[in-house]
């Protein structure tokens, strides 16, 4: 109860702060992009610093190609933080373990087991392992790890979850227990986390990285149970929304993915599950999105659906000024539509509240 009240107080304070910020500044906090380069003087890193300084982006995401060495990573992250005139940027990565690790033993970062292997070791081992992982990531200058995966391992032939051992199990209570250990370990290090892949990718037959994924006939409401548990316990910093399609939650629109669906985000996640934290899209350059929507349509639909942070890996066709372009789309639409501007203000308040909790904003 006290944790919930504290979070509510932070959100109210952040909402008040939103009124003191310009539309440009608020919109910028919603943009997270990837980059090219693995050194602090590389052009892609310099471009990020400029966009952070101009308050056009609020965070960055690392891929493995951005990691040359741990000292280089620390130098880049320090430079990105120093560029910020206001709240510090989210510096994010996927370090789940197993197949999904951006920092690897090849650069001197000890490997983390997959979720499947962690579950085999038991909850006590998981608690110690994730506490260590959180500390080691924070020491490199990261402040958000995109995990835990709370998908249920329902389809043994699933090409994106089961195939790589990314789920803790089939049972929602088991998954929620290991996810809570992941979150606690990162929180102890001052890091944020993101539950993924809402509303559940474990039953799918395809991989949304590659293209359209329809889960209408295979998805189960039980896939929401880990979210329900972790949200009720106040452990959900962010929820990452997947690009999967369910005909019953698409407002009658063919092939509208969850990441662009108000029924999933505003209806189920915020309404039914009561989540009032930060909603972040999965990578908006995955095939399921890129093949169907223009950049402008993607950005506008994502905000109207209820996403607070728009994540672009910037890998489909690298553009060093992508963050600036997304920011310009947001600002132009907000200037033309007061309702859209109100959405930006709401998202800014949630983002700022999380950054305050993580020590990234005063």
Language model regions located:
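Gram-negative bacterial Sec-dependent N-terminal signal peptides
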Residues: 1-20
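N-terminal hydrophobic targeting/anchoring segments and the immediately downstream early-domain regions
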Residues: 19-105, 311-312, 353
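Active-site mouth loops of central-metabolism enzymes
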Residues: 32-43, 115-126, 209-221, 285-293
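Short, acidic/polar
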Residues: 40-52, 126-133, 221-227, 294-299
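Second-shell residues forming the walls of enzyme active-site clefts
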Residues: 60, 68-83, 174-335, 339
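Glycine-rich anion/phosphate-binding loops
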Residues: 69-73, 120-132, 173-177
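Glycine-rich, aromatic-flanked loop segments that form ligand/cofactor-binding clefts
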Residues: 84-110, 130-153, 175-199
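Mid-to-C-terminal alpha-helical segments outside catalytic/metal-binding sites
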Residues: 329, 335-362
């Amino acid at each position: 109860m006290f944790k919930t009240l504290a979070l509510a107080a932070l959100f109210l304070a952040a909402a008040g702060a939103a009124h003191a910020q310009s539309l440009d500044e608020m919109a910028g906090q919603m943009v997270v992009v990837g980059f090219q380069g693995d050194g602090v003087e590389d052009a892609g890193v310099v471009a990020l610093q400029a966009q952070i300084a101009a308050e056009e982006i609020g965070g960055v995401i690392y891929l493995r190609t951005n990691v040359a060495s741990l000292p280089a990573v620390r130098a880049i992250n320090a430079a990105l933080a120093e560029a910020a005139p206001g709240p510090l940027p989210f510096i994010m990565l996927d370090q789940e373990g197993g197949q999904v690790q951006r920092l690897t033993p090849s650069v001197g970062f000890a490997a983390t087991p997959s979720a499947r292997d962690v579950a085999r070791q038991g909850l006590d081992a998981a608690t110690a392992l994730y506490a260590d992982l959180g500390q080691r990531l924070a020491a490199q200058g990261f402040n958000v790890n995109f995990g835990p995966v709370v998908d249920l391992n329902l389809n043994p032939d699933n090409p994106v979850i089961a195939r790589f051992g990314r789920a803790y199990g089939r049972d929602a209570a088991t998954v929620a227990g290991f996810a809570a250990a992941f979150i606690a370990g990162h929180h102890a290090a001052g890091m944020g986390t993101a539950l993924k892949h809402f509303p559940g990718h474990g039953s799918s037959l395809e991989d949304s990285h590659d293209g359209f994924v329809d889960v209408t006939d295979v998805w189960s409401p039980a896939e929401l149970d880990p979210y329900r548990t972790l949200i009720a316990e106040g452990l959900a910093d962010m929820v990452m929304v997947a690009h999967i399609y369910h005909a019953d939650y698409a407002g009658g629109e063919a092939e509208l993915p969850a990441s662009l669906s108000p029924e999933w985000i505003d209806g189920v996640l915020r309404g039914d599950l009561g989540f009032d934290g930060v909603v972040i899209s999965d990578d908006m350059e995955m095939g399921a999105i890129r093949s169907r929507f223009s950049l402008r349509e993607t950005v506008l639909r994502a905000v109207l659906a209820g996403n607070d942070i728009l994540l672009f890996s910037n890998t489909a066709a690298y553009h060093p000024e992508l963050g600036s372009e997304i920011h310009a789309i947001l600002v132009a639409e907000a200037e033309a539509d007061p309702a859209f501007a109100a959405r930006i203000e709401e998202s800014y308040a949630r983002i700022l509240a999380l950054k305050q909790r993580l020590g990234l904003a005063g």
